[in-house]
């Protein structure tokens, strides 16, 4: 009897020691098992900056959600200027007799607008119109004036024949199919008055080229440097585009999260691995600037045309980013529209390439580009993740996501 109790007592005591040790590990252990509330976890908005869709004012309530909230995108205003300069440079060296198709002394163009409530679209529209002297103080598709521009040493009057927001039948913006339909209508309506086509992005530009009656040889400009657009430049179908350095953006999104998850604070969050080498020896090759007032990291833009398109061919990844030995962390990332050409063909592949190098286990959920609920309904099981990256359907929906992180 004594032997029986003695043996079992040892087991009980041993079990108690194990349980006590486990409790100690949970309550006093290292940061790996420390419970962090969702509201305190790193949050990065990317590609679609939280802002008012009418005024363009940055939504600082969302940006100040916590001390670990940032935005990663590109220099929208600078990008609009780059696209405008790309167009001006092309026209300056062009033959006016070729550009002015009907010889009326007028350069007529049509404009594909992505989303009148999106800061990037607004900036690109402004850059285009400033370059062509048709800017009238507003990015509104209908608020425009006549201008003038140098074409091969000759001054031509410039008329925006029509500007239109490309909204699909499902309500989605930046819609390539809508651009195809619009171009078909424009070609019929304006005929040889159309001397140039300009688009807020490559997806819509490529959509225009899909129109069966697209006027052959008419120059067309896009924006994003998507793979199909780059190939179209090489084939002579697209005249030019703008690279917003998608690899720099995707890597910066992941790098900021990595820095925050590694416990970095202050300026180290937006410089380590971005403008200076991080502890793993990584540094993004392309320039990325930090704007303190809006907590935004912005990649710089560059023009792409027939003289340099081969530099931007798909598959050229940033060699400055190498495999790290950092602890693996889980990140939940939303994509506002699974059908968005830039995100699906360029941004998401870049994320999927760099995330494993930074030891980030990325879970991507995608929306329909129309309803915020298509993303938010998948923004779930938040306690299973160490950080979040958000790409909203509407730029003023930041609070819809942060409300989910309160609990």
How would you name each of these model-derived features?
Residues 103-108, 112-116, 120, 132, ...:
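Hinge/cleft segment of the Venus flytrap/periplasmic-binding protein
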